[in-house]
Structures are given as structure tokens and as C-alpha cells.
């Protein structure tokens, strides 16, 4: 007699509970932001809808010491990507992937630091900055983002690189390591756990669910972009400068010109939709089918990260089947490569010079 088949109801029930959580929390987050909007309008209606004109980029975005602005059009999607490159062509490639709400400029300290021994490329991800931004939400699925990096590597004439990712760029870096391990000499991730750790942890820990509330808020069409833009992009400025979330407590490592660079880029017409569309596809792409990373890996973590609980960093090791080092920096914020650049650069140098091998 054949063994009884497991009831089909259980997977269906799990899926129902999962999507009920996603959309239920999405509705809650939307309600909170709607109340914030109404409060702002009630207090200062004119200020709420005011936006300063920003026709010209700040001078720091054209600083020649950071490198050369370049563009590459990849074959598969036909999209054109913008990047800033420093260091001589022909040197080993170091590819830098930024997070949200960032762009290539988040790597300014690393562009200067590593150009002596590497061809350092700081990319604007799909939909960000001067890179092309497809209109359709489906164009931002994780499979597309992974394919972008593979095709960019080919277009730059490299088969391997040192890959460094922060925040959402860290998510993509982990996935590249899972899908295309042969492309990565060494993997460095800053303040983002292995994606499988993240998806499992967030469902079991309400505190992390709260910290990641923007993932759910971003599922709503158009409203998140609007909320980021009111009060002359106050929410964007707050992320980088507030006591709780800022770069080095109240943004002490961020100059006025640095902050204006971020506001300039994201204040351009339609500049927020592409970045937020990255998040609008995440729940349909996870959990992963494959998990293990076989590349030597360094995970750097700011202990004062307002968005990610440090316990996720410690659990990540189980998904790396190779050399793995975790370094947690006390008083480091979520924006670690900008917050403590000298320390971060030193740790990266040490890891790059270590003799590690692929198991």
C-alpha cells in the first residue's frame, strides 16, 4: 500500500498565512504613514508640499579624485548602467553595490582607498541615479538584478571580481555568490545577513519585523514615493542624519554637500520609483531555492544598526561553506562604510591580503 500523501491544505494554509501577514502589515504601515501625512498637512500645509529646485548637481559628484564617470550597455536587457571607476584598467576588479536610498557616491571612501591595487567600480544599480530605470515593476525582480551584475562583469571584460555589497546591494551580493560562485574571488557584505537568515528571522522576531517595516510599506503603489518627497525630502534626510538612524549619530560623518548629493539624485523626476520597485518584488522571490555560499566571505556589521538586528549576522555563518569572518563594530551605524571608513577599509585590506581558499 502506498504511503498516504501529505494533505495539500497545509502548504496552502502556510501560503495564506504568509500573504496575510505581508498585506496585513502593509496596510498597518500605510495607515501609520497616512496619519503622518495628515499631521504634517495640519501643522504646515505649505511646507508639506514644498520642494526646493535642484537643477545642478553638487560639486562633490564631479570630484575627479573619486574617479571617472562611465556608462556600459549590457546585451541581455539592453539597459545602460552608470558607474564611477577609479584605478587602472587591467588591475583586478573590485565591484561595489550600494543599498537604499543610496547610489555610487556611498562608496566615495572606498573609491579613493582601493584604486592603488584594484580597478574599483561603484555602480548605480538598475533604477538608481543615472542608470536606466525600466517602467514596469516586474523588471526589478531579483533574477533581473542578478543577471545585471553578471552581464556588467562580462561587459567590463572581467570573469571574476572582489564583490562588495551594502544593505540591498549586500542582498544582491549574497545571491550572486549563491548563483555564480565562480565569478567571485572574495565576498564582502556590509550590514545585510544571508537572505535565508533574513526571511526566516523576520517571521519569528517581531522586533525585526518592526525594523523592516519599510519593506512592507513599499508594497503600496506610488504612496511611498510621495511620502519620501514631502517636506522637501525630509524622510530621506532623516535616514542619514537622525539620532537613531543617521550616519555616525546625527550624521556627523556626512557633510552638508554629501547630504545634498543624496537629495539631488532622489529629487529628480521619477528617481524614487526604480529603487522602491526593488522592494516591490521581494516577497514573490523569497525564500530561496538554493542557499549555500562557497566563497571566502567577510561580513562587517555596525552594532548600532537601526534596521537590522545583530543576531542575524551571527546566524549567517551556517550558510557559508568556506572561510567566514564576522566583525561587529561597536557604535557603527547601518551606513558603516561611510560611518567608519578608515576602520572598514582596514578590515577589507586585511581580508583581501589573507590567504583563503575555496573549499
Curated annotation (Swiss-Prot):
UniProt organism field? Mus musculus (Mouse)
The residues covered by the AB hydrolase-1 domain are: 92-337
Is Transmembrane helix included in the keywords of this UniProt record? yes
Mode of membrane association: Single-pass type II membrane protein
* Protein's UniProt name: Epoxide hydrolase 4
Keywords attached to this Swiss-Prot or TrEMBL record, sorted alphabetically, are: Hydrolase, Membrane, Signal-anchor, Transmembrane, Transmembrane helix
A GO cellular component annotation here is:
membrane
User: Catalytic positions?
Assistant: 167 (nucleophile), 279 (proton donor), 334 (proton acceptor)
Amino acid at each position: 500500500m502506498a504511503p498516504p500523501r501529505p494533505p495539500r491544505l497545509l502548504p496552502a494554509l502556510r501560503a495564506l498565512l504568509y500573504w496575510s501577514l505581508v498585506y496585513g502589515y502593509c496596510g498597518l504601515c500605510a495607515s501609520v504613514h497616512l496619519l503622518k501625512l495628515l499631521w504634517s498637512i495640519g501643522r504646515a500645509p505649505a511646507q508639506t508640499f514644498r520642494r526646493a529646485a535642484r537643477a545642478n548637481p553638487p560639486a562633490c559628484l564631479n570630484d575627479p579624485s573619486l574617479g571617472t564617470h562611465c556608462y556600459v550597455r549590457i546585451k541581455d536587457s539592453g539597459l545602460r548602467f552608470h558607474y564611477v571607476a577609479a584605478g587602472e584598467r587591467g588591475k583586478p576588479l573590485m565591484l561595489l553595490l550600494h543599498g537604499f536610498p543610496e547610489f555610487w557616491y556611498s562608496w566615495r571612501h572606498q573609491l579613493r582607498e582601493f584604486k592603488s591595487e584594484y580597478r574599483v567600480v561603484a555602480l548605480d544599480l538598475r533604477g538608481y541615479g543615472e542608470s536606466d530605470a525600466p517602467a514596469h515593476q516586474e523588471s526589478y525582480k531579483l533574477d533581473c538584478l542578478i543577471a545585471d551584475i553578471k552581464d556588467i562583469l562580462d561587459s567590463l571584460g572581467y570573469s571574476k571580481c572582489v564583490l562588495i555589497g551594502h544593505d540591498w546591494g549586500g542582498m544582491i551580493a549574497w545571491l550572486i555568490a549563491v548563483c555564480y560562485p565562480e565569478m567571485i574571488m572574495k565576498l564582502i557584505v556590509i550590514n545585510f545577513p544571508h537572505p535565508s537568515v533574513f526571511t526566516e528571522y523576520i517571521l519569528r522576531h517581531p522586533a525585526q519585523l518592526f525594523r523592516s517595516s519599510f519593506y512592507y510599506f513599499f508594497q503600496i503603489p506610488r504612496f511611498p514615493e510621495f511620502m519620501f518627497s514631502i517636506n522637501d525630502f525630509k524622510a530621506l534626510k532623516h535616514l542619514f542624519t537622525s539620532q537613531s538612524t543617521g550616519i555616525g549619530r546625527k550624521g556627523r560623518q556626512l557633510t552638508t554637500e554629501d547630504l545634498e548629493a543624496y537629495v539631488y539624485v532622489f529629487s529628480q523626476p521619477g528617481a524614487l520609483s526604480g529603487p522602491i520597485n526593488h522592494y516591490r518584488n521581494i516577497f514573490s522571490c523569497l525564500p530561496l531555492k538554493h542557499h549555500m555560499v562557497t566563497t571566502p566571505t567577510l561580513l562587517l556589521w555596525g552594532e548600532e544598526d537601526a534596521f537590522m538586528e545583530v543576531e542575524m549576522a551571527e546566524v549567517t555563518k551556517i550558510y557559508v561553506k568556506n572561510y567566514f569572518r564576522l566583525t561587529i563594530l561597536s557604535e557603527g551605524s547601518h551606513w558603516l562604510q561611510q560611518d567608519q571608513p578608515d576602520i572598514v577599509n582596514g578590515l577589507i585590506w586585511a581580508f583581501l591580503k589573507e590567504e583563503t581558499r575555496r573549499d
